[in-house]
């Protein structure tokens, strides 16, 4: 099944009109702490590894399953779109039916020349938060899965 794609503005509109929808920011903990869509929770789909670049988070689906039921409406986003597209696919494989990937992510998607091809959440002027505490941080999400 193809992953549904939405723009940052569409994501914001859904989150504003449907409080039961959750936004999962799949970027690293550091990226999340530097700013994220208001109301987002952080569950990284991959972690940085100095020797290998990015490595998949083996607990990604488990942490999502612990925190959110399979019938939950979920929007996933990353920095530009590719990581969240992969995360959305993993969630669909795990049985989540209502998952959308936010194209452009938080920072915007660029072509090889550096031109913005899909503006991100921040550039769209949407609400940004730096809250990284209980209930939104990866550490608080993963603690429930232990």
Where are these regions (language model features)?
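Rhodanese-like catalytic fold shared by cysteine-dependent sulfurtransferases
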Residues: 1-22, 29-73, 84-146
């Amino acid at each position: 099944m193809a992953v549904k794609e939405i723009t940052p503005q569409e994501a914001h509109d859904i989150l504003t009109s449907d409080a039961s929808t959750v936004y999962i920011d799949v970027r690293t903990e550091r990226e999340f702490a530097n700013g994220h869509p208001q109301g987002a929770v952080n569950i990284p789909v991959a972690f940085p590894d100095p020797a290998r670049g990015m490595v998949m988070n083996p607990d990604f689906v488990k942490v999502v399953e612990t925190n959110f039921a399979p019938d939950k409406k979920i929007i996933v986003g990353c920095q530009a779109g590719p990581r969240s597209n992969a995360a959305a696919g993993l969630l669909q494989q795990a049985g989540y039916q209502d998952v959308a990937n936010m194209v452009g992510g938080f920072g915007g998607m660029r072509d090889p020349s550096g031109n913005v091809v899909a503006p991100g959440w921040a550039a769209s002027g949407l609400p940004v938060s730096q809250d990284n505490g209980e209930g939104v941080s990866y550490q608080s999400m993963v603690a429930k899965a232990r």
